[in-house]
Amino acid sequence: TTKLLSTLKEDEYILDVVGPLGIPTPIEKFGRVVCIGGGVGTAEVYPIAKALKEAGNEVIGIVGARSKDLVILENEMSAACDKLYITTDDGSYGRKGFVSDQLLDLIKSGNKIDVVYAIGPIPMMKVCGSVTKPFGIKTYVSLNPIMVDGTGMCGGCRVTVGGKMKFACVDGPEFDAHQVDFDELIMRNRTYVDLEKTSLRKLEAHICNLSEKKLAGEVVK
């Protein structure tokens, strides 16, 4: 679906959009809050950081990416946060390492952190939760498991939180990181990996075929 969206041209549009889904993100005056965005998760954590700042919090941001060219929304996050840290896996920009490394340093610095929001790849969110748990810091993660209808009917987005089954589309997307069964979530998200790869190959071949027809001046339907 992401690949299909990227093929849309000017004046083309999505017929219908359903939303917002789930439960609103908890926004209140907590005190000192750390907002962490990993990869494209930065796009989701940015409005949260902005809202938390407007609610009167001291907001510390951490943005992580594999390399400098993949860092996004740096200026926007900088404007929304009192302090912003950048980390890259390869050290090409900011601190070399992971967002969890920076998070642990902030915790160990002695300045009290009241709440953490971590959004990004599942392994990243799992590690951030593991970092904050020994210190008893409330940590929210935003889960985006396999989702079909978005109303809780299909059960595709079910996750185990605190030993109970939840649906990310209606009960989430934010959950307590210390209660999420991340191992189960990772396993479920791999269910359709092979089918997704096959589908992507077919789609790319189809797009390539259409492009060749256009270049040849054929009518494309």
Where in the sequence are the language-model features?
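Reductase modules of NAD(P)H-dependent flavoproteins
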Residues: S67-K221
